[in-house]
């Protein structure tokens, strides 16, 4: 790798935030601050569901009763990673079992040790939530199991994982309250999940505001950036001997490093050909896993060189070498689906999206054999105009 002082520069670009979006988010935060609930909606290509959301600081028996009566879903308290660690709550997942598809991080169920009767009443559950969310709470203040299910929010919030768990904690923090929330899925009277049209009627009926994960992402991106570029160099990739520019990024959450491999220039002018690739030492270097990681990576390099310009964002592995060995032993196809996250790279793409934003990219053509729309992608100021299959997929079809 050779240092090059004339490397292309891609200054970070601010997202254009329209007044309507700003007004919606600020109004929602103000409602959370004042003790009101909001309806928090995720992306239509994720669950396309809405949760009643309230700051844990404002929980009450009346609020629990409203959620149980009108929301009808599961009532959970959302806690930061630090609070879950403080309370010494183990995750509700067996080491040899795959976790929930969307990476929902349940801990074991809890109950307040004192101040409750059976634990299931609205007042009992409100009390348990107050105890669990308190900054003064200790492990001995709770018993296990109980009638309240805590959810652990990822550090970095919706900028790292675009879910209602993280969003509820973010909203409480942005409102100047203790970063803990209470959420409850909204169901229709017939037991089906309420979708956007149902949620709009629900909001009008109960005079509640609707917020979306994508809106909150856009709002946070105006003031918070989780990645920074720390080094750049010129390298030769592929088999053509052509120079690429490699930028090294580091995130501010846990100092994980990622790479942006850039070929060509004028990335901002038209839709840029991009590949988001989750790294795997065994798969990419030694081809030891049953997935197509190494082949896909090489095909992406070739495709971008033929195109004349493009970017590969190489993200750190979701797990560690032990996880990769277990994946090889168990025949797990995608190494990105193992280890610390069972949701795969397309579920928690926030850091990679921020890298693309830093390069000035707004619209992209995504190189992938899994043509699904990323949840909340518009919240990062990015738009996928086309899914481009890799060569091996085109040959197979």
Residue ranges and their predicted role:
Residues 1-397:
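Catalytic domains of riboflavin
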């Amino acid at each position: 790798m050779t240092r090059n002082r004339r490397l292309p520069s891609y200054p970070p670009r601010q997202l254009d935030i329209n007044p309507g979006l700003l007004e919606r988010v600020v109004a929602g935060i103000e409602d959370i601050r004042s003790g009101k609930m909001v309806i928090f909606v995720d992306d239509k290509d994720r669950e396309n569901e809405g949760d009643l959301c309230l700051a844990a600081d404002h929980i009450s028996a009346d609020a629990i009763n409203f959620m149980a009566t009108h929301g009808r879903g599961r009532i959970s308290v959302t806690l930061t990673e630090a609070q879950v660690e403080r309370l010494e709550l183990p995750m509700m997942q067996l080491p040899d079992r795959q976790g929930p598809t969307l990476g929902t991080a349940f801990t074991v169920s809890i109950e307040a040790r004192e101040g409750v009767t059976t634990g299931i009443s609205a007042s009992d559950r409100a009390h348990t939530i107050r105890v669990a969310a308190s900054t003064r709470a200790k492990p001995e203040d709770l018993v296990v199991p109980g009638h309240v299910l805590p959810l652990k929010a990822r550090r970095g919030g919706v900028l790292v994982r675009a879910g209602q768990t993280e969003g509820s904690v973010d909203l409480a923090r942005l409102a100047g309250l203790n970063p803990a929330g209470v959420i409850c899925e909204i169901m229709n009277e017939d037991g089906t999940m309420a979708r956007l049209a149902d949620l709009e009627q629900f909001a009008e009926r109960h005079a509640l505001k609707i917020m979306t994960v994508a809106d909150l992402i856009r709002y946070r991106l105006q003031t918070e950036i989780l990645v920074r570029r720390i080094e750049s160099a010129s390298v030769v990739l592929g088999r053509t001997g052509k120079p690429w520019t490699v930028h090294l990024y580091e995130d501010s959450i846990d100092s994980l490093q990622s790479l942006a491999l850039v070929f060509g220039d004028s990335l901002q002018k038209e839709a840029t050909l991009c590949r988001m690739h989750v790294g795997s030492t065994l798969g990419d270097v030694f081809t030891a896993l049953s997935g197509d990681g190494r082949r896909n990576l090489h095909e992406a390099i070739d495709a971008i060189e033929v195109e004349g310009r493009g970017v590969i964002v190489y993200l750190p592995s979701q797990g560690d070498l032990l996880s990769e060995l277990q994946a090889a032993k168990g025949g797990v196809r995608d190494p990105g689906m193992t280890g610390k996250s069972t949701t795969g790279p397309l579920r928690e793409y926030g850091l990679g999206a921020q890298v693309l934003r830093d390069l000035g990219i707004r619209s992209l053509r995504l190189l992938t054999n899994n043509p699904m729309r990323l949840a909340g992608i518009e919240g990062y100021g990015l738009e996928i105009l086309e899914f481009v299959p890799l060569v091996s997929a085109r040959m197979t079809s």
